[in-house]
UniProtKB/Swiss-Prot annotation:
Organism from which the protein derives: Methylorubrum extorquens (strain PA1) (Methylobacterium extorquens)
Gene3D superfamilies according to UniProt: Ribosomal protein L10e/L16 (3.90.1170.10)
Binding partners and assembly: Part of the 50S ribosomal subunit.
Single biological process term from Gene Ontology: translation
GO molecular function: rRNA binding; structural constituent of ribosome; tRNA binding
Main function: Binds 23S rRNA and is also seen to make contacts with the A and possibly P site tRNAs.
Cellular component per GO, a single term: cytosolic large ribosomal subunit
Keyword line: Ribonucleoprotein, Ribosomal protein, RNA-binding, rRNA-binding, tRNA-binding
Protein name: Large ribosomal subunit protein uL16
Length: 137
């Protein structure tokens, strides 16, 4: 699964996901992409599950690009622990995704296969998405 090799600080504030994506909202690599339509935190496990679903449907042909990276440590305290005594330990990694952000791109396969692969990948994610296609020049 994806996670940073090294971070400056172990823990971060929760923060909010406000506004539309400021970058990463255009197709840069592939012909088809999966665009996020609502703000959400997506975990590294969800990204990996979506990637596996996409590559399995494409039968390992073509190419898949992951355009989001989980760089936010999400902390949790153990169950049945009293309140207080500091913030919990980092439990997993997540990525903040703004509306309009391209999360996955695919290329090198037919349109129907690409759309079906991205649809199956979208089923693994907790956000509403849309499959987009590069306009032929």
């Amino acid at each position: 699964m994806l996670q940073p090799k090294k971070t400056k600080f172990r823990k971060q504030f929760k923060g909010r996901i406000s506004g539309a994506a400021k970058g990463g909202f255009e197709l840069n690599f592939g012909q088809f992409g999966l665009k996020c339509l609502e703000p959400e935190r997506i975990t590294a496990r969800q990204i990996e599950a979506a990637r596996r679903a996409i590559t399995r449907e494409m039968k390992r042909q073509g190419r898949v690009w992951i355009r989001v990276f989980p760089d936010l440590p999400v902390t949790a305290k153990p169950t049945e622990v009293r309140m207080g005594s500091g913030k919990g330990a980092p439990e997993y990694w997540a990525a903040r995704v703004h509306p309009g952000r391209i999360m996955f791109e695919v290329d090198g396969v037919a349109e129907d296969i690409a759309r079906e692969a991205l649809r199956l990948g979208a089923a693994k994610l907790p956000v509403r998405t849309r499959v987009i296609q590069r306009i032929a020049d």
